[in-house]
Every structure is written in structure tokens, then in C-alpha cells.
Amino acid sequence: PDRRPPEDPITPPPPTKEEQRAGCGWRNENGVGFRIIGDKDGEAKFGEFPWMVAILKIEPVNDQDPEGQKLNVYVGGGSLIHPQVVLTAAHYVATAKTLRVRAGEWDTQTTKEIYPYQDRDVTHKEIHKDFNKGNLFYDIALLFLSQPMEMAPNVGVVCLPPRNERAEAGTRCFASGWGKDKFGKEGRYQVILKKVEVPVVDRNTCQDQLRKTRLGRHFMLHSSFMCAGGEPGRDTCRGDGGSPLVCPIQYEKGRYVQSGIVAWGIGCGEDRTPGVYVDVGNLRDWIDDKVAGRGIEPTVYTY
């Protein structure tokens, strides 16, 4: 018999074929490997949404010493649409100078996860030319990374919808994110990735609901937005700006398409007011154009 002492008992078996499926958009509904703690309400499992990334800003610990020790400050969420390209909201990244993207993260307080996270620096960003900080129209950006992420059970790409395709009203989708504040020991943020299930809301219904808020009765929902949520207590503030809203692809169990990017909301899951998301299908042409402009094939995120 093999008398060698067992290695670290948390080492998982080699990933099975199932975990590394070809193509975009595969959610690991039961997580990757195993979990030691029981599932908590609203927590994503390790590796459940492998396209989910954290966007970090690199800042000096001491402003007087800009070349000294650096701190990773959490800016918001994003999604991997290609091993080297991240989709996010423009208002989080428009003014930031040095950004870094972390894929495969789950619990931000520990590095003991079974598969490591991967960090890459952002070398180029594309902000939509019509992005407007005041009203957040066209709140979309692409971040191009210094090197591709390595695909792994906890790191994968999401699919994007065909141009102008919207998820049908009532479709139950997932938003995910780590909450606000900063990465690291000082910050108060969601330590473990959170998820919230929200139904897609028809645009007219959404506009009517939003007119009952402080936006007033003449509010017009811009074509670059879509809506989801509005169920009491299902709080989309958990999903950060920039984070993906993913919806199931019909007839392909376990496969998801990114219909929205978390943009803004009024209050938080109160009074049945839906959350507002950037409409990804409506901006698919822009995404394809910018990605192809940097020599990358849009086929990676096409299903």
C-alpha cells in the first residue's frame, strides 16, 4: 500500500471534464470542488459564476509616498467576455488611472481557496463615446488586460446576447457582486461573493414604476437600459455597479448569457421598484466593434 502521508487534504481531485466545458456561459451551479461551510442565504458558491471579476484600483497607502507600499482598492464588479477582455460599467472606471482585474475570486479575506485567483493589469480601456456621467446613458466600458486569464474551473467567460436581443419579461436572472467599500482587512464589504435572483421587468412597466419615485412622472427610460428586480427584500444593492446580470439560455441547462450590467437603482429593493441595468444586447454592436478593433474575435462570447 502507498504509505506516503496524504498531501494537503483540501487539494481537490483533478478537474473532471464536466467542470471545463467548452464555450461561454457555463455556471457551476453546485460550485467547484467542495464547500466546508453550509450554504448561507445569498452567497454564491466557489466558482459558481466563473466570469465574475473584481476590478481593483492600485493606490499608494500613503499619498506622500506614491512609490511606496500599494493598496488594492475595490472599485466594482465586471465580467470576463474573453480571456483578455472585461465588460463593466463606465462610471466606475472612467477616471481611474491604474486598474487591475482579479478573476476566480470568491472569499476576499482568504487565499486558501482550492483554485487560486488570477490578477492582470489593465493596459487599455474603451469607454462608450456617448457615456454621460449625469444621466449614466451608455454606461459601458471594456477593459483590455496585459495578458489573457488562464481558463480554470473557477475562471471562464460569459456569453453575450445577439444584437438587440432582450431577455423576456419574467425571466429569472442572477446579479452578483461583493458590495461596496474596499478590498482588504480594513474595509466593510461582502467578504464572500453574493448573488441575488431577480426577474426581468418589461420596459414600460419599469418606466411606470420609476415614475412613482423621485424621478417624477415624466421620466423616460433610455434605450441603453433594461430593468430587473422589484421583488420586496431581494436587494440588488448587493450587486455592485459593473457586475453582470446573467439570464439562462433557453434549452441549454446551466448556460447563461449576460443581459445586463448593474447600473443604478432607487433605494434598495423597496416599494417594488426594479433595478436598472445597462442593456447589453442593445450595445452588442459597440462591444463587437471595439473588441475586433483590438484584433480579438467576438466568437468567444457568441453562442
Swiss-Prot record:
Provide the assembly information.
Answer: Heterodimer.
InterPro entries to which the protein is assigned, alphabetical: Peptidase_S1_PA, Peptidase_S1_PA_chymotrypsin, Peptidase_S1A, Trypsin_dom
Against SMART domains, the record matches this protein to: Tryp_SPc
The protein's name in its UniProt record:
Phenoloxidase-activating factor 2
One GO cellular component term of this record is: extracellular region
User: Which lineage do the record's taxonomy fields give for this organism?
Assistant: Eukaryota, Metazoa, Ecdysozoa, Arthropoda, Hexapoda
Task: Fetch the Pfam families from UniProt.
Answer: Trypsin (PF00089)
What is the stated purpose of this protein? Answer: Binds and activates processed prophenoloxidases PPO1 and PPO2 and thus is involved in the activation of the prophenoloxidase cascade probably following the recognition of pathogen-derived products. Binds the A.niger cell wall component alpha-1,3-glucan, a fungal pathogen-associated molecular pattern (PAMP) that activates the host immune response.
Q: Which controlled-vocabulary keywords does the entry list?
A: Disulfide bond, Secreted
- Where is each Peptidase S1 domain found? 36-292
Q: Which family does it belong to?
A: Belongs to the peptidase S1 family.
Q: Which cysteines are joined by disulfide bonds?
A: 173-247, 206-227, 237-268
Main localization category? secreted
Q: Which GO terms describe its biological process?
A: proteolysis
What is the name of the gene encoding this protein?
A: LOC113510063
Its subcellular locations are: Secreted
Sample GO molecular function, one term: serine-type endopeptidase activity
Outline the segment boundaries, as ranges, of region: Disordered. Answer: 1-24
